[in-house]
Amino acid sequence: MKVYFSGSIRGGEPDRGWFKRLIRRISRHGEVLTENSFGYSPEEETGFDDAWIYERDMDWLREADALVAEVSAPSLGVGYEIAKAEQWGTPLLLLYREQPGRRPSAMLNGNKALEMFVFTEEEEALKAVEGFLAQLESRSRDSSSQ
């Protein structure tokens, strides 16, 4: 399985340690296409050509069997990736860390076609990722055996 992981890199306060833990968990189920995108420092990331990043990421997103997006920090890029994945029929799981005085984006939370998992503890989110990917793997096995 190929999974596209999405999270805020330039916007908000990217939690790179949390993203790396998520990526490690996702990688138990297959290839994380965007894994290396989260290994760059913010300075390195802004040094890449934006058109190159866009083309690379859209290629990966087209190739992905699923998208897991961490949406706790607002990000236009993450929202764009979610919209494209939804348009293309790619299964999605959105993760939102509950924060006092803040709410998830109404455009994401109000879209009943999107699965958003709200969590307070990281382990809850990791278990949600496991369940989401295991369900996709099961569907894939079922459809290939028919």
Language-model segments: what does each one mean?
Residues 1-146:
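Conserved catalytic or regulatory cores that recognize and/or transform ribose-phosphate-containing ligands
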